[in-house]
Design a protein with these regions (language model features):
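Short capping segments at the starts of secondary-structure elements
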Residues: 29, 41-46
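Short helix-capping/hinge SLiMs at alpha-helix to coil transitions
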Residues: 25, 39-42, 57-58
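Basic amphipathic alpha-helical segments that dock to polyanions
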Residues: 67-77
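Short, small-residue-biased leader/transition segments that mark boundaries at the very start
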Residues: 1-6
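Short alpha-helical segments that sit at the start of domains
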Residues: 8-35
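DNA-recognition alpha helix
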Residues: 46-59
Length: 158
């Protein structure tokens, strides 16, 4: 499910604490606030979205640079996944996040998540030589219905 339960929030805090200790990073309240905010966002987000969330919550004034550097830290700690959709970087929480795939519209750039049991099974049954898979993500590129419709309308108007 997409709702984060309290137990998961505690767990990710614990993962962060261990990561910071092992790597000799400071345990700043900002880092925990950013983590908490990220884990309250459903689906994908970019730095601007995260920045606005943080600003609106008013807990911490965090610069975009700080957010960016913190996210790099979280990716290394396996708490955040980075996606490169065309030229925009999008992020999402990694812990306890069910495997899902992405449909990406090449016209408007909209990213839609979807799950598919058949795909899941097919990938699970795929034999990988000398390789142990930990996770995966599938990107399917195409044109969304909104853009398809807009294109059709343009053709008619000519």
């Amino acid at each position: 499910g997409s709702e984060m339960c309290i137990r998961d929030r505690d767990k990710v805090k614990q993962i962060l604490t261990e990561y910071l200790q092992v790597n000799g990073h400071r345990k700043t309240p900002e880092r925990y606030a950013i983590l908490d905010t990220i884990y309250s966002i459903k689906g994908h987000f970019d730095i601007d979205t995260l920045y606005n969330y943080m600003a609106n919550e008013g807990k911490f004034r965090v610069s975009r640079a700080t957010l960016y550097n913190t996210i790099i830290l979280f990716i290394d700690a396996k708490l955040v996944i980075k996606h490169q959709f065309g030229n925009s970087s999008q992020y999402e929480r990694a812990y306890n996040n069910e495997t899902h795939h992405h449909m990406i519209c090449t016209e408007c750039g909209k990213v839609t998540e979807f799950q598919d049991e058949n795909l899941k099974q097919a990938i699970a049954n795929t034999k990988l030589k000398k390789f142990h898979a930990s996770h995966y993500s599938l990107y399917i590129y195409g044109v969304c219905s909104k853009c398809t419709w807009a294109k059709r309308r343009k053709k008619k108007d000519k």
